[in-house]
A protein has these predicted regions:
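Residues within membrane-spanning alpha-helices of integral membrane proteins
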Residues: 5, 49, 102-106, 110, ...
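Interfacial loop-to-transmembrane junctions
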Residues: 69, 206-230
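Transmembrane helix exit motif
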Residues: 56-66, 87-95, 99-125, 209-210, ...
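Residues that define the loop-to-transmembrane-helix transition and helix capping
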Residues: 42, 70, 96-99, 159, ...
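Small-residue-rich hydrophobic segments that form or flank transmembrane alpha-helices
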Residues: 4-74, 83, 130-137, 144-205
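Interfacial loop-to-helix junctions that mark the boundaries of transmembrane helices
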Residues: 1-3, 38, 90-99, 187-195, ...
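Membrane-interfacial loop-to-helix junctions in multi-pass transporters
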Residues: 1-7, 119-124
């Protein structure tokens, strides 16, 4: 494996551990890195979705007894058809616009929600989550940070949020992989990265689940926000300079 591949696999491990601790966020870091190293959406998003399917599946198993299964049914109503409608459009997407959109979504996700919990009725929240996953998610890959807010229910414990978000995200990523395949985009484009990344995210989930109760939430939040800010600034720079016809490389 090249040094770049090793670095990407390490990011996969850390991103899965991050999501196992916080419930979300790790996927945004991973897709941000895949775009930052120059992968086109037709390569980056199918690879990312395949990896995230296993990451979220392992997290679902870790929090299985806390899952609210009705949420998956509402999610599927919009989450099943949407990816197949949007998949053919991915090939025509401009990677630099996607970088800007993803950077904006990352920064917007860090704005505190009013009241801290989601007031939208459950069924509409989960149907909206399915729609966002199958539309915007087909281009930016990661949806956890902005879809995750729809799962912050006042009656749910932290473990229920993590487990239920994980099972819907696993379903969403599987649907995206199938939709990409139907549009002719194969997850085997980077098979040399896929297998080690899958192993890394499963290991990261196990480690993250163990650390879940040990990490200070205040310290974790500061570190997490710092990583996301740096990553979003890199994506913003790449997007703006790319649209302007300039190029640069930080990593």
């Amino acid at each position: 494996m090249s040094l770049l591949a090793i670095a990407v696999v390490l990011v996969g491990f850390l991103s899965a551990a991050l999501s196992a601790i916080a419930g979300l966020g790790g996927g945004t870091v991973l897709i941000g890195v895949l775009y930052a190293i120059g992968l086109h959406p037709t390569v980056a998003v199918p690879l990312f979705s395949a990896v995230q399917f296993f990451s979220n599946l392992s997290r679902t198993l870790a929090y299985l007894r806390h899952v609210e299964w009705r949420a998956l049914g509402w999610f599927a109503l919009t989450g099943v058809p949407a990816p197949f409608l949007f998949a053919p459009l991915v090939a025509h997407a401009d990677v630099h616009w996607i970088e800007l959109v993803l950077a904006a979504l990352i920064l917007l996700s860090m704005i505190p929600a009013r009241g801290g919990r989601n007031p939208i009725p459950q069924r509409w929240s989960f149907m909206l989550a399915g729609l966002l996953n199958g539309s915007i998610g087909m281009f930016v890959g990661a949806t956890g940070l902005f879809v995750g807010r729809l799962f912050l229910r006042p009656e749910w414990r932290r473990e229920t949020v993590i487990g239920t978000l994980a099972v819907t995200q696993a379903a969403g990523h599987l649907l995206k992989v199938l939709a990409y395949a139907s549009a002719g985009f194969s997850i085997t484009e980077r098979l040399d990265w896929l297998v080690p990344l899958v192993i890394a995210v499963i290991a990261g989930t196990v480690i993250g689940r163990w650390f879940n109760r040990l990490v200070s939430e205040a310290l974790f939040a500061r570190l997490f926000k710092t990583i996301l800010i740096v990553l979003s600034l890199k994506l913003l720079a790449d997007g703006v300079l790319g649209l302007g016809g300039w190029s640069w490389s930080l990593f």
